[in-house]
Amino acid sequence: MAVMPPRTLLLLLSGALALTQTWAGSHSMRYFYTSVSRPGRGEPRFIAVGYVDDTQFVRFDSDAASQRMEPRAPWIEQEGPEYWDQETRNMKASAQTDRVDLGTLRGYYNQSEDGSHTIQIMYGCDVGSDGRFLRGYRQDAYDGKDYIALNEDLRSWTAAAMAAQITKRKWEAAHAAEQLRAYLEGRCVEWLRRYLENGKETLQRTDPPKTHMTHHPISDHEATLRCWALGFYPAVITLTWQRDGEDQTQDTELVETRPAGDGTFQKWAAVVVPSGEEQRYTCHVQHEGLPKPLTLRWEPSSQPTIPIVGIIAGLVLLGAVITGAVVAAVMWRRKSSDRKGGSYTQAASSDSAQGSDVSLTACKV
């Protein structure tokens, strides 16, 4: 089944970095599946992507020529052919499950065969800085609305729709939660630890933001101050504006964190200020790559050049990334900070022939 899906490309773009919330000191592995029916044009399109923290590492697209799970990060390419064979089998099995589920759900909702419908799934696990299991997830949605979710106890389900009560009863009878919990607490954690170790130069690094401020006159009476943070990793960052030391949260225009195209991220926050009062406003930047928070104030004598080319390039790449990974869902926001890198010993039981994802064929709606 599915996870809360974006229904338009705009939502997909705005949700590019909207991964599930994690806590301080933790790391996460998430898989996002999306299936979209297309009546009269063959079988549904199935796209899956896997993320470790903010980094996409695998991708599968049923429309691709290869029909294979494909690497999206250098450190995953070292996995052997057994790994890729199993991952591909899991993806194809999940695609077929979703194909059946789309028909089942259409019946639950008494919908005609003419319209296009969407199923999504998000599942995964978090580990702490010591590599131990913290929590697991499984959330599903249908046509952009919550459908069913695994509860925090990993033993029960919450149905968010009347039709989902049917699914809940089916899954309870099939002991689906127990099967999923075994994966989340076991193989999911083992593979996440393995990935963190193999990709530690990328996944456990911290790149502090490069910051500056720009000034944009609106009229003779007002101007926009924009606070920029560029080239940082991980994606979690806080930009806040203050006026005479008081937070201006409600008056701040804040964009979603965006990939820059080089493995780092970008973000800006802006406020409209009365002309002549710019010095009363300060921008405060917090990121784990900084030894202490930064405070920026507009300095008229040293107005920087806005890196428009870099920003546009990042936005163009963002479109390509999300179109290729149609599943980075719009609901979940990474809000953690202070994720400290550690050494994650590879679990001996991480069998490449099993793969790090899970075939969800048992969870038919």
UniProtKB/Swiss-Prot annotation:
Residues 299-308 are annotated as: Connecting peptide. Its main location: membrane. GO terms for cellular component: early endosome membrane; ER to Golgi transport vesicle membrane; external side of plasma membrane; extracellular space; lumenal side of endoplasmic reticulum membrane; MHC class I protein complex; phagocytic vesicle membrane; recycling endosome membrane. The modification Phosphotyrosine is found at residue 344. Residues 346-359 have a biased composition (Low complexity). Disulfide bonds join 125-188, 227-283. Residues 333-365 are cytoplasmic. It holds the Pfam family MHC_I_C. The chain crosses the membrane at residues 309-332. Residues 25-114 are annotated as: Alpha-1. Residues 115-206 are annotated as: Alpha-2. Keywords: Disulfide bond, Glycoprotein, Immunity, Membrane, MHC I, Phosphoprotein, Signal, Transmembrane, Transmembrane helix. It is found in: Membrane. SUPFAM superfamilies: Immunoglobulin, MHC antigen-recognition domain. Residues 209-295 form the Ig-like C1-type domain. Residues 207-298 are annotated as: Alpha-3. Glycans are attached at residue 110. It is a single-pass type I membrane protein. Gene3D superfamilies: Immunoglobulins, MHC class I-like antigen recognition-like. Residues 1-24 form the signal peptide. Heterodimer of an alpha chain and a beta chain (beta-2-microglobulin). This is Patr class I histocompatibility antigen, A-108 alpha chain. It comes from Pan troglodytes. The gene is Patr-A.
